[in-house]
């Protein structure tokens, strides 16, 4: 069966899922009203950093049509709505633009086209769309920044929200190419399943961070404890047991805010989500708390070096990044000169007072306090003993190969 797949909204999500569709053998039409994104993709350039994505775009380029003409979607058999839904500073979604976009799309696609909502929307959204229910679906995406294409190509399962009708043949043919269990349920169940996945992740991250801090305070070692937890079948080896700096990236925050609204509306456990958010914000302060302890001992310190600006390794996204959170905290004090290096971030438009170094070596030579804010693998190779100018290291991710003479320098890790 020959199918043409359309993607509307060339976000991180849309581009990776479109490339996955091409790898599975389908021709793909990619639409976005942003001419700069279309121009970039036509030149085989991805507007963000993601492992293997650009390489596979080049391999499958002949199967793509990139366009900002909405009518080019007319002959698609499946159309995925994959545009980012914007959020405010609290994580609340603004659905106005996505609703307008869908209204435009349903006016031009053919009547037998399958319309699939792929972006993050609250329960009840998909059912409200005016399109024949036997061709209207919600597909749960479980994209992970830094591993997005692999997740799109090899999902553990695919969760589909649908009406009571049988699964559409064309859509079913497309889904079976991914060779994983397909879980069918009603629209609201699928929409809530997406939120449920993230709330479980958030709860796990939050519990890990609390227990890790207790470990620090009582002299326990969280790494030893986490190894024991992974061997418990009720928890498992893939659980989020590495302590971190709160919830970042934007997607988890969005679902936490949706979850909070449901709790408030139903008047149940309203403080649960509020407390999670408080703990997350407190954890984002971890670097700053350690920093304040250090400058009490070394009042002459002026040079700060930050290794890593992205909110996690293998991405260039800085949304809700702990390092940016720290930069905001110290930027009011002109006493400090701040240098930063990240392998995928070359400039900070909103923080022009931060000097971006060309490499880690330049940064290390020009700092007295070193903060390891993102656990990039290349940072593990750094030998701190070469840099006598560094007095203290805040290394919350406990990069195990960080060579350091602990007698000469303080080395502050997380969870131990």
Where on the chain are the PLM-derived regions?
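Structural/interface elements that position substrates and couple domains in central-metabolism enzymes
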Residues: 1-416
């Amino acid at each position: 069966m020959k199918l043409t797949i359309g993607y509307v909204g060339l976000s991180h999500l849309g581009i990776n899922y479109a490339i996955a569709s091409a790898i599975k053998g389908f021709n793909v039409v990619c639409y976005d009203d942003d001419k700069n994104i279309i121009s970039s993709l036509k030149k085989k350039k991805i507007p963000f950093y993601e492992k293997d994505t650009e390489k596979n775009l080049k391999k499958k380029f002949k199967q793509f049509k990139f366009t900002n003409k909405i009518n080019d979607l007319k002959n698609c058999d499946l159309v995925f709505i994959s545009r980012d839904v914007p959020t405010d500073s609290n994580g609340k979604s603004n659905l106005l633009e996505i609703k307008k976009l869908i209204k435009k799309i349903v006016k031009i696609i053919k009547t037998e086209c399958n319309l699939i909502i792929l972006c993050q929307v609250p329960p009840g959204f998909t059912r409200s769309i005016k399109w024949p229910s036997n061709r209207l679906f919600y597909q749960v995406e479980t994209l992970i920044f830094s591993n997005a294409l692999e997740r799109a190509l090899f999902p553990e399962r695919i969760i589909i929200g649908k009406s009571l009708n049988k699964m559409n043949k064309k859509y079913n043919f497309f889904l079976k190419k991914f060779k994983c269990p397909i879980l069918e349920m009603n629209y609201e169940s699928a929409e809530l399943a997406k939120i449920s996945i993230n709330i479980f992740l958030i709860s796990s991250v939050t519990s890990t961070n609390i227990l890790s801090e207790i470990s620090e305070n009582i002299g326990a070692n969280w790494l030893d404890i986490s190894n024991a937890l992974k061997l418990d079948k009720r928890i498992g080896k893939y659980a989020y047991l590495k302590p971190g700096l709160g919830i970042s990236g934007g997607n988890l925050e969005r679902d936490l805010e949706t979850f909070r609204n449901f709790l408030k509306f139903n008047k149940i456990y309203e403080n649960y989500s509020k407390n999670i958010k408080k703990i997350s914000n407190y954890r984002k302060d971890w670097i700053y708390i350690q920093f304040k302890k250090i400058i009490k001992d070394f009042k002459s310190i002026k040079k700060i070096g930050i290794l890593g600006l992205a909110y996690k390794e293998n991405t260039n996204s800085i949304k809700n990044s702990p390092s940016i959170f720290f930069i905001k905290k110290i930027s009011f004090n002109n006493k400090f000169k701040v240098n930063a290096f990240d392998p995928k971030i070359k400039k900070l438009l909103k923080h022009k007072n931060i000097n971006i170094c060309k490499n880690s070596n330049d940064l290390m030579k020009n700092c007295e306090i070193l903060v390891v804010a993102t656990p990039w693998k290349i940072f593990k190779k750094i030998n701190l003993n070469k840099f006598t100018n560094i007095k203290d290291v805040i290394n919350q991710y406990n990069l195990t190969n960080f060579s350091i003479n602990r007698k000469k320098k303080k080395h502050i890790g997380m969870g131990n």
